[in-house]
Amino acid sequence: MYEVIQKRKTKIINVLQSPELMRLIEDPSNLGISLHFPVSSLLKSNKCTPMPKLSTYSLASGGFKDWCADIPLDVPPEIDIIDFYWDVILCMESQFILDYNVPSKNKGNNQKSVAKLLKNKLVNDMKTTLKRLIYNENTKQYKNNNSHDGYNWRKLGSQYFILYLPLFTQELIWCKLNENYFHVVLPSLLNSRNVHDNHSTYINKDWLLALLELTSNLNQNFKFEYMKLRLYILRDDLINNGLDLLKNLNWVGGKLIKNEDREVLLNSTDLATDSISHLLGDENFVILEFEC
């Protein structure tokens, strides 16, 4: 599965290496870059597929840091933007695949099979998601339709994000907005050669402030009654580098969230027709929640 996703990730990086984006990345005043798109961009009814939107995190004129300039990214015409969007969605949702549930015998073929199962599930789930979003838009329910399952990482997002946040890491960060919950999966720092002191990276809260600011901006755009940021941090990373973050969690307005009960899931009748959900889980992560 890793090799399959890595190929998709490489394709994404190739698209992101546009002159426009590289200029923003190389500008030292930009402390973060966000690229995002609504899943409604996948609708075949669109006469022209919308381009992803680009925002930068930098020091504003008032002396504070903020996300600004939500403008379309200029993507070369030879790029299949729909394929790009699906690659991003697959990379985000694959973060929850539990490797040990993939049989070791003929693992290469099994990984391809899992990737195909996941993609098929995403396509089917996306049909349901798009129908719901269209209904909410037509009935204007989106204005105060705070979903009861927006917290559920198993639900597809209404928007997907790629973050480049050198305050934390040089790796891409995968995110999605699901109703009034912003889900952010942090990459591992344990094997990063670009971070000299992983421990101090977690202690330095500038990266967390950037994510909170981005979540707050989303809240202003969608006018939800409340907006929450959910961070998914790999357990090994947190144990080795991030315990100080846990110690100071109350000071930064965060709280620990329980992982899902897999016993309930595994005994669910829904799995009778779903051949991939049992391979997904959040138990590799420590989940932190912040209200914005």
UniProtKB/Swiss-Prot annotation:
Belongs to the ODC antizyme family. Ornithine decarboxylase (ODC) antizyme protein that negatively regulates ODC activity and intracellular polyamine biosynthesis in response to increased intracellular polyamine levels. Binds to ODC/SPE1 monomers, inhibiting the assembly of the functional ODC homodimer, and targets the monomers for ubiquitin-independent proteolytic destruction by the 26S proteasome. GO terms for cellular component: cytoplasm. It comes from Saccharomyces cerevisiae (strain ATCC 204508 / S288c) (Baker's yeast). It comes from the Eukaryota. Interacts with ODC/SPE1 and thereby sterically blocks ODC homodimerization. This is Ornithine decarboxylase antizyme. The lineage of its organism: Eukaryota, Fungi, Dikarya, Ascomycota, Saccharomycotina. One of its GO terms (molecular function) is ornithine decarboxylase inhibitor activity.
